[in-house]
Amino acid sequence: MLACVHNTVKLKNFRYMNKKRLLLFTIVLLSLDYYAKAQTDSIKNYKLNEVVVEGTRNYAIADGVVYIPSKEAKQHAININDLLARMMVAGLRVDLGSNKVETTYQGEVHFYIDGVEAQDWEVKALRPKDVLHVEYLKSPADPKYKNYQAVVNLVMKKYKYGGYVLGEVNQSFVYNSGNYGAAAKVNTGKWTLTGLAEAYYRNADDITHNTGTQYIFSKDNIIDKLTEETQREHTKMFTTAVNARYISDKLTFTASAGYRYESTPVNNSDINITYTGNNAPDNGKALTEASSKGMLPYINTYFQLSKLPRNSMLYGAASFSYNHNDASTLYTFGSPIFNATEEDVYLPDVWMSYAFPLYKQNYMTVTAEYKSEIFNTLYTGTDNTRQKLINNYVYARVRYNHKFSDNWSASAQIEVPVNFYKVNDDGYDTKPYVNGFVVMNGRIGKKHSLYAYAQIMQMPITPSFYNTVVRQDNEIEGTKGNAGLKPQRYASALMSYAWMPINGFSLNADVIWEEIMHDIVPLWHAENGLMIKDIVNSGNYDIISASLTPSLSLAGGKLNIQAKLYYAHEMHSGIRNFSLNNYGLYPYVSYNMNKNFSVSAGYGKNFNKGFMRGGYGTTAQFSDNLKVNLQYTAGNFYAMLSVNSVLRKHGWVKSWFDSDNLHSSEYLSRPWDGRYVSLTMRYTLDFGRKTDHGNNARFEGSAKTSVLK
């Protein structure tokens, strides 16, 4: 801690010092040393002549750790994801290729801004220089965090009045896409008003999709099909949202509304088809002409009452979203095959939580929630039916949080959801469940932290599977819904360990087991001369995975290095019936060259294929990807030049499916998987005085569909 002392001070000078002054000088130095060790929540440098004392950049809080970004990290980061990557938060990883933040065990991360949940684009609109500190929370007990397993809460600088206007432009070359947005925030007293408008387009004219499929109708009737497809896809999207938030000592209230419009007017393909085998169709060329559009308005409110009697708290929220989706496909291979859907979706949700203290600092939280998903879909073409799905949930939750000490706490929750749903004119199928989890958070000293989590839950149903549609897709394939599917159950157990001995180094290790019971997978079978893809429950899917993620910061924070090593063993006991191993390597590095320029790079490589969850039933492997960013910052102006897939001109996704009646392999190469260059520029214009907190607009609509895939 005592960095240096002037070399010009000679030992002989001390011989003539007054004893009292020498004693006083010694006491001051010892006090400074003690103060530096005690300041675990500050990154400031205190300079007294030649003595330099530096504190740590992280400290423990309830359910997690606070990380304080360095001045250099905030200065060079172009957005929040970039800031988190440079901070190298133990347990988090930022994928530069997908611009996504996830846990090191591949769990979803939910963002909050000053304790209020935020959507992705809202986080994107924030300025890194306004971040005071970052709270990384694991299964936080506060009901406003909705029992999320991983939460990043961004605590922002304060505004008493004023705010800023932000504009950002992102344009890609070779891969033709662009994203243009503007956000504004105004603070006045206890009110914060925010608005955002964003436009996006993507024109991809050279998507390559090649397949090889074997259809086994019987021992004597086997057909092989090879396709070479060139696809053109043009997409555009517009989003706007407004938000008002009121904050006082006792009340937090937010109200927001938004609208999103998305359109894909062009989604066409030219397909060369080659058949071999008995009773095979003739070879030829197929054409696909498809288009789709959808709109999504929403409204949302949230309140939080604090300082109620007995130090209790009351939380609640209500939201409503509406989706309208239209899509059509015309497939021509000899005779045309037309399919279209028109869909309306209604998504109401309301919940309330009451939290109250028990013994000492322990809390009990009770929650009641009602949510519904109402789908009304009209199919035309090869299936002319109207499909209705009503999926309702009523939840009752009780959570208890126990604090053993300042370093150790535990939580347990019991949840009883009652799911009652109906398909078309059938009666309601009512199924109660018992879900729950237990979690342990703890620290051993100041350098070691442990997190353990185990849960069992009912998985949400996939609306597109629950119908009675039988549809012909092409000359040999069809798709069928299944209204009688069992909901899936999910169980997992996680152990996570983090070692943070010094500011510039951390090591995170995770081991997790997951199981999906009654897994939903495709079942291909012959029916009426077609090979039909049915959706069925079959067996359990299990995965055991482990990851090790060291992080190192050198040269006073100028050079940051992180690398994730990943291993997984995956098994399926159903009709998919496989056992495979998967390995991954994901390094990241950033370097601040000077005050204005910095460079960062991220690489990802999977060494084997892995299982694609969600009812697709395929195994897949992605090409490796090296992305390099060169960034420039000056005041409120930021610019970033990025090169995606530096090592590989054409990126790809390969997938495989094997069953008794169908074997297939696919190769898909899209412009955004391969090499392209993009330029991002961002500028903010400040007005007023900063003394309250940052942007809080968010788009809270939920995009849902029941259309058969």
Model-derived features with residue positions:
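Short, acidic, small-residue-rich periplasmic hinge/interaction motif at the N-terminus
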Residues: 39-73, 97-98, 138
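N-terminal periplasmic accessory domains that precede
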Residues: 50, 80-85, 99-102, 135, ...
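Extracytoplasmic beta-strand/coil segments of soluble accessory domains associated
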Residues: 81-116
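Short acidic/polar hinge/loop motifs at secondary-structure boundaries
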Residues: 114-141
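Outer-membrane beta-barrel translocator/receptor signature
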Residues: 145-152, 160-209, 235-238, 251
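Face-selective signature of the C-terminal outer-membrane beta-barrel domain
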Residues: 237-263, 287-427, 431-455, 501-513, ...
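Surface-exposed extracellular loop regions of Gram-negative outer-membrane beta-barrel proteins
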Residues: 420, 446-493, 511-529, 647-663
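C-terminal beta-signal and adjacent terminal beta-strands/loops
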Residues: 633-709
